[in-house]
A protein has these predicted regions:
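Conserved alpha/beta-domain cores
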Residues: 1-52
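A cross-domain feature marking catalytic cores of carbohydrate-active enzymes
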Residues: 11-13, 57-59, 84
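Alpha/beta catalytic cores of nucleotide-metabolism and tRNA/nucleoside-modifying enzymes
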Residues: 39-55, 63-138
Length: 138
């Protein structure tokens, strides 16, 4: 963190669960892994070193409500990308009020970038609005 050549750090849905040995077959552990990682950074007193850096969250673990889990860390998270809102919506899945925001678990179908947008565009937009509301509440 003290290297001045590093100005952007990515926290992935792959590398953090992998570091904790919970990258597969354990959605609850995976869902909580980045929160656990952020808490460890805080406990180790590493956040002051992060203030001069930008942190990017790659993807979402098991649902959009992971955003709410990070509510205490918004000063450190610069950006967060995910196709979850659009991809779930286009496939007929609506984010919900369950603990993760996806009561049936993460939609695992690989994103098809040549997908033809059809009837579910409204649902995709609703999911985007759901995420925006989470972000503004954080």
């Amino acid at each position: 963190l003290s290297n001045p050549d590093i100005d952007y750090i990515a926290f992935s849905i792959l590398n953090i669960p992998l570091a904790y040995g919970c990258e597969s077959n354990n959605p609850t552990q995976k869902y909580l892994s980045r929160l656990h990682f952020m808490n460890r950074l805080e406990d180790e007193g590493l956040f002051p070193a992060l203030l001069g850096k930008r942190v990017h969250f790659l993807g979402m673990t098991e649902g959009p409500n992971e955003i709410s889990l990070m509510r205490g860390f918004t000063d450190f998270i610069d950006t967060w990308d995910s196709s979850a809102a659009v991809w779930a919506g286009l496939n007929g899945i609506k984010f919900d009020s369950s603990p993760t925001g996806l009561s049936q678990g993460k939609f695992e179908k690989e994103v098809d970038f040549s997908y033809k947008v059809g009837d579910n565009i409204r649902l995709a937009k609703d999911n985007i609005n759901y995420i925006e509301e989470l972000c503004y509440a954080a």
